[in-house]
């Protein structure tokens, strides 16, 4: 046993007295009544706020969603296997917030912005509330700048502007994610920060998407937020709001951002699961009554801010999956009514080898030509009409035996325009080359070519135009000189 001198004992006691604090810390503490299926019912937290974070005895975080007269219904941010009935729960006095900032660029994180890519921790200087109000009417300006996707069919006929919400909708395996990833890849030199939110997907699918973005050099300006299929329903519900909060941080700094929610059907299903377990009354298709508000409060955060607020923008590309092409189901109709247009992908077109499988007839952009450069507006005006007439004639020609010359020519033109719009995945086309391809298609330069010769011909034309001063000229303005430049190159290769 160590012998202590009296003066040592007295100095230790003196130190203890000096360090003694009379501060009293108040904690609101409750008790777990019931736990299971990612839901906990807590008794005794009378002063808790809706959406407040709760801390359980095992360190699991929960969110208070149901405030009832005798208990609080909370969703758990984890499996909650170590939470026992009768254990203690503390209220934190805080609403959910996540770290934001440029430190997240190039990283893959979960719905709570914890890194899951094995590249070490992330130290950010700022945080932001997961749920924050959307910009008001005065804070916005109308969409006026184009956001090029690099996909000819979209940039020509269904243009997307910075600050727009454009829905990508279609059955499973029709190329919805491919369009979203191509759009991210095309932002390489455009100074746009991209956030890709994967909700309820297989981990292998997310890994493949991250790998593709990394291969194309797109991870330098991209943040991936993922809540996989095996994650808790609460994390799948939160992931889109986390993505929006990350993008909002950059938007309010005056930067252009692009957010992809892949897909909101899975988020709605996770929210339905949570609501039913919390015993909220079910409505149509067993979804709770506020499922419209679930998506509207998320998508309304996308905006083009006015000059006083820095002129930043958040463009949202939500994805919704349909069953057997049924666009009139509950979630699809909800999201269609919230967004500024939709790109409809058809499984019939996909199976017929037309990729991207965009059904031009029922796809629409409500922003329209305000989100196009002047040259594209000039050239692509006739394209949608020609394709619509072709679709109508093609259906009619299956029943007619003999067709007149004009009808045959129109059918031939439509087939060649379809070839122009075909595009392989992860190979976005610059806007100036798209204009040249469409100009060749609508002005009859491809009419005499066989269908299999269309793509090789266009690729030769594009290669030559790249080396001329055509790209910079066509971006500034459509003029007779630009048109003559195009005609010279087309006639040279048409011989």
From Swiss-Prot:
Keyword annotations from UniProtKB, A to Z: ATP synthesis, ATP-binding, CF(1), Chloroplast, Hydrogen ion transport, Ion transport, Membrane, Nucleotide-binding, Plastid, Thylakoid, Translocase, Transport
Site (Required for activity): 363
Membrane-topology annotation of the record: Peripheral membrane protein
Catalyzed reactions per annotation: ATP + H2O + 4 H(+)(in) = ADP + phosphate + 5 H(+)(out)
Cystine crosslinks: none
Main location: plastid
Record-linked Pfam families: ATP-synt_ab, ATP-synt_ab_C, ATP-synt_ab_N
Cited InterPro entries: ATP_synth_asu-like_sf, ATP_synth_asu_C, ATP_synth_asu_C_sf, ATP_synth_F1_a_nt-bd_dom, ATP_synth_F1_asu, ATPase_a/bsu_AS, ATPase_F1/V1/A1_a/bsu_N, ATPase_F1/V1/A1_a/bsu_N_sf
GO molecular function: ADP binding; ATP binding; proton-transporting ATP synthase activity, rotational mechanism
Subcellular location: Plastid, Chloroplast thylakoid membrane
GO cellular component: chloroplast thylakoid membrane; proton-transporting ATP synthase complex
Keyword Plastid: yes
Annotated residues for binding of ATP: 170-177
EC number(s) given by UniProt: 7.1.2.2
Quaternary organization: F-type ATPases have 2 components, CF(1) - the catalytic core - and CF(0) - the membrane proton channel. CF(1) has five subunits: alpha(3), beta(3), gamma(1), delta(1), epsilon(1). CF(0) has four main subunits: a, b, b' and c.
Matches recorded under HAMAP family: ATP_synth_alpha_bact
Function: Produces ATP from ADP in the presence of a proton gradient across the membrane. The alpha chain is a regulatory subunit.
Family stated for the protein in its record: Belongs to the ATPase alpha/beta chains family.
PANTHER family found in the cross-reference section: ATP SYNTHASE SUBUNIT ALPHA, MITOCHONDRIAL (PTHR48082:SF2)
Protein name (record): ATP synthase subunit alpha, chloroplastic
Organism listed in the record: Cyanidioschyzon merolae (strain NIES-3377 / 10D) (Unicellular red alga)
Gene designation: atpA
């Amino acid at each position: 046993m160590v012998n202590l001198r009296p003066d040592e004992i007295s100095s230790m006691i003196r130190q203890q007295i000096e360090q003694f604090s009379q501060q009293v810390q108040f904690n609101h503490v409750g008790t777990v009544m019931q736990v299971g299926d990612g839901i906990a019912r807590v008794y005794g937290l009378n002063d808790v706020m809706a959406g407040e974070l709760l801390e359980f005895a095992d360190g699991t975080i929960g969110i208070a969603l149901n405030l009832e007269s005798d208990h609080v219904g909370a969703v758990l941010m984890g499996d909650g296997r170590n939470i026992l009935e009768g254990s203690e729960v503390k209220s934190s006095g805080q609403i959910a917030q996540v770290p934001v900032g440029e430190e997240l660029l190039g990283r893959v994180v979960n719905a709570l912005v914890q890194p899951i890519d094995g590249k070490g921790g992330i130290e950010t200087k700022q945080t932001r509330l997961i749920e924050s109000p959307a910009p008001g009417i005065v804070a916005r300006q109308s969409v006026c700048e184009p956001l090029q996707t690099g996909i000819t069919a979209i940039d020509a006929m269904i243009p997307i502007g910075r600050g727009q919400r454009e829905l990508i909708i279609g059955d499973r395996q029709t190329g919805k994610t491919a369009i979203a990833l191509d759009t991210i890849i095309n932002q390489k030199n455009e100074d746009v920060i991209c956030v890709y939110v994967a909700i309820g997907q297989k981990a292998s699918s997310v890994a493949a998407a991250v790998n593709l973005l990394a291969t194309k050099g797109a991870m330098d300006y991209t943040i991936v937020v993922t809540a996989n299929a095996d994650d808790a329903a609460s994390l799948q519900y939160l992931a889109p709001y986390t993505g929006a909060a990350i993008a909002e941080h950059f938007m309010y700094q005056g930067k252009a951002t692009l957010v992809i929610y892949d897909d909101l059907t899975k988020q709605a299903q996770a929210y339905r699961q949570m609501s039913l377990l919390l015993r909220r009354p079910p409505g149509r298709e067993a979804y709770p009554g506020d499922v419209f508000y679930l998506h509207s409060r998320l998508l309304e955060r996308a905006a083009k801010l006015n000059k006083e607020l820095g002129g930043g923008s958040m463009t949202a590309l939500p994805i919704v999956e349909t069953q057997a092409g049924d666009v009139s189901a509950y979630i699809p109709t909800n999201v269609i009514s919230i967004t500024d247009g939709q790109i409809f992908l058809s499984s019939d077109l996909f199976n017929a080898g037309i990729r991207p499988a965009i059904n031009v007839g029922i796809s629409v952009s409500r922003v329209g030509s305000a989100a196009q450069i002047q040259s594209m507006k000039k050239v692509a005006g006739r394209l949608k009409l020609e394709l619509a007439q072709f679709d109508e004639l093609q259906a009619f020609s299956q029943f007619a035996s003999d067709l007149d010359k004009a009808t045959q020519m129109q059918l031939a033109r439509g087939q060649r325009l379809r070839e122009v719009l075909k595009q392989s995945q992860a190979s976005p086309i610059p806007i100036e080359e798209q204009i040249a391809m469409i100009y060749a298609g609508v002005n009859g330069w491809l009419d005499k070519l066989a269908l299999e010769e269309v793509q090789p011909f266009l690729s030769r034309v594009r290669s030559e135009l790249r080396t001329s001063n055509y790209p910079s000229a066509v971006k500034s303005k459509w003029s007779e000189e630009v048109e003559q430049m195009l005609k010279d190159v087309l006639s040279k290769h048409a011989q």
